[in-house]
């Protein structure tokens, strides 16, 4: 699928990725045009001639971003296509991808931070995910922190996603929940996400939520936040905690 503009200055392209057990799930690459006119690419996907040309028509690629320790399979191809771009990745990815030269490690500060606020999700060392809030469009970009898979993906994968709680709504799968090693740290990180201004959710896996995304994200994260004492600046975040 080619690039599709979802709002001013933001484009997405979907591809299908095969995982373990033969499961195939949709994945999304997001391209953001910065105020400089340069491009910032989140979770690069397959980069054939046609897609590289489409991206080139939008502007010069300045940054390639691998947002966690699993979203890197197509990074070398993107580097080959856009050799002048800086590569920024989740902490620890440089050990998994010694074939890629990294310009920086994702954290709370970034050269694009005025437009795309990075928020590291602590307490999940298996993923080391960093999510981003695109301030101009009010969009939250996530990789594996949240899914929104609603389309049928075949009997096996749909059944698996239902069993792991990652199907039919904005949700965190049980696989990700099991990856939490420091619950207070993870909860504090997710609360920082909820304190940011966003209305749209752009996940790597699943449907985009165009409006009202914050409420959906609150519901998905409520299991993690239920015991957290919220700071005064977060009192406006009303998290509904379900009985479990």
List where the protein language model places each region.
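Metallo-beta-lactamase
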Residues: 2, 7-8, 40-41, 88-129, 135, 181, 185-188, ...
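Active-site HxH/HxHxD metal-binding segment of metal-dependent hydrolases
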Residues: 53-112, 222
């Amino acid at each position: 699928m080619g690039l599709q503009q979802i709002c001013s200055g933001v484009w997405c392209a979907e591809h299908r990725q095969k995982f373990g057990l033969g499961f195939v799930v949709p994945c999304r690459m997001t391209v953001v045009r910065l105020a400089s006119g340069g491009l910032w690419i989140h979770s690069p996907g397959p980069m054939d001639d046609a897609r590289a040309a489409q991206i080139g028509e939008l502007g010069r690629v300045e940054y390639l971003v691998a947002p966690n320790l699993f979203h890197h399979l197509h990074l070398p191809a993107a580097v080959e296509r856009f050799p002048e771009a800086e590569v920024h990745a989740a902490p620890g990815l440089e050990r998994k991808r010694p074939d890629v030269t990294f310009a920086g490690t994702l954290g709370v500060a970034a050269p694009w931070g005025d437009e795309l606020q990075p928020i590291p999700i602590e307490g999940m060392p298996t993923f080391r995910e960093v999510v981003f809030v695109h301030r101009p469009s009010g969009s939250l970009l996530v990789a594996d922190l949240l899914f929104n898979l609603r389309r049928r993906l075949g009997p096996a994968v749909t059944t698996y996603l239902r069993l792991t709680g990652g199907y039919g709504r904005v949700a965190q799968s049980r696989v990700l929940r099991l990856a939490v090693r420091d619950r207070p740290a993870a909860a504090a990180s997710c609360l920082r996400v909820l304190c940011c201004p966003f209305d749209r959710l752009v996940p790597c896996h699943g449907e985009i939520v165009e409006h009202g995304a914050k409420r959906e994200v609150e519901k998905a994260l409520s299991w993690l936040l239920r015991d957290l004492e919220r700071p005064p600046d977060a009192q406006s975040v009303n998290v509904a905690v379900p009985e479990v």
